[in-house]
């Protein structure tokens, strides 16, 4: 007889685990899913095919891993669940590297939750520019529970909230491609102060003026 718990009551919800690179997002997703095994709760993990760092599994930088189903797009998750390959006893759906999906993943997550599934999602909150990555801003709205993790700044040791990209030792330009699959060869975690993106545009006409004004004000105080 199946154990009675929150997952057996057909009440769905969405959990979002997010933060910069090297914050332990995938490790936290794996931890939450792995503990379900002790309560005999069935789960299934999906990941986007574009993430080629590991094949047919999600893997944290601490070495933990879980098998996963690779999909090209968010709607394929629903197709798989409707197929004969799906175990009808599955209560929890895990989704890793969610930033690589488009906005349709939001609808998929909502549909799953509305139909009794617990959906646990992990992914980057910001791209290398410091802007919302893919569907993440909308997922913040839809999620019932949000866990925002931090890493350690490579420059000063403070809490890191941003992912910095460097190519051949130089900061990536704002106009570079958003997606560049890689790890420590391109990326590091940094705090807000040490996050630099050359040629970043400003929406407000007086933003650059304010930045120059404030820098001069600080410089004059130090004289």
UniProtKB/Swiss-Prot annotation:
Binding site for substrate: 128, 178-182, 187
Domain of life: Bacteria
GO biological process: one example: DNA biosynthetic process
Keywords: ATP-binding, Cytoplasm, DNA synthesis, Kinase, Metal-binding, Nucleotide-binding, Transferase, Zinc
EC number(s) given by UniProt: 2.7.1.21
Reactions catalysed: thymidine + ATP = dTMP + ADP + H(+)
Active site (catalytic residues): 97
Residue numbers binding ATP: 19-26, 96-99
Localization per Swiss-Prot or TrEMBL: Cytoplasm
Main localisation: cytoplasm
PROSITE patterns assigned: TK_CELLULAR_TYPE
Gene3D superfamilies: 3.30.60.20, P-loop containing nucleotide triphosphate hydrolases (3.40.50.300)
Stored InterPro entries: P-loop_NTPase, Thymidine_kinase, Thymidine_kinase_CS
Positions of Zn(2+) binding: 153, 156, 191, 194
GO molecular function ontology, one term from the record: zinc ion binding
Pfam entry (one): TK
Assembly and interaction partners: Homotetramer.
The family this protein is said to belong to: Belongs to the thymidine kinase family.
Designated name of the protein: Thymidine kinase
